[in-house]
Amino acid sequence: VKPTYSPPRAFGLGQNTGVSVKRDSLSLSFAVGVYGAAFGAASVAAHFSVLQTCAISLLTFSGASQFAAVGVVGAGGGAFSAIATGALLGTRNGLYAVRMAPLLKVRGAKRIVAAQITIDESTGVALAQNNEKDSRTGFWWTGFGVFIFWNIFTLIGAVSAGLLKDPAAYGLDALVPAAFVGLVWPRLSGKRSYYLAAFAFVFALSLVPFVPAGIPIISTALLAILMGWRA
């Protein structure tokens, strides 16, 4: 049986109407956006410039993919491994788009904008509502909210880390795994997902001594996709 790709509705949001949808969307946007500071600092610690770091957030705008790609580069991996890792983790956003397209019913330039902000949070808030109007409101407010806060905090984190002579000496490179776990943990639901996450973690660690940087993450992502597809 093929799985249904709906993002978790575990963001602490229930079914709301009108103003409450916007309020919850902005609250969630700020909470998620703060992680952008961790990405900004981690990216600079991995020897990306402030400009490059901000460009990654503006153009990629996918937290897990960004942290994974920067982590690969920071560990000594090549550009191909970093891009492949980020792309694999970002495939879920494409699956969300399939779910959201009939609901949003957008075309032209608006469709391109919608694609950029189709993420876990915007899709999750949209699907948590009980009518199409509130769903669309939740999607747009959350999507734009996270985008704005994420990029603001990315800049703050990058500039702050850039003021340090050696960001890695302050342990900022540890922000990548810590923030990655922080992003993933709320999305786990049920014993099966926890078991799969634990197995993937052990599997990735077991590969580290034997393969180049980036390959463990790519292999783990492929394993997770395979397990999810067979569920």
Language-model segments: what does each one mean?
Residues 14, 83-173:
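Helix-loop-helix junctions within the multi-pass membrane cores of secondary transporters/permeases
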Residues 1-21:
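Short, Lys/Arg-rich, polar N-terminal cytosolic tail immediately upstream
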Residues 5, 17-19, 32-35, 148, ...:
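Short acidic/polar alpha-helix capping motifs at helix-coil junctions
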Residues 134-219, 226, 230:
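Membrane-embedded alpha-helical modules
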Residues 22-115, 133, 149, 216:
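Pore-lining transmembrane helices
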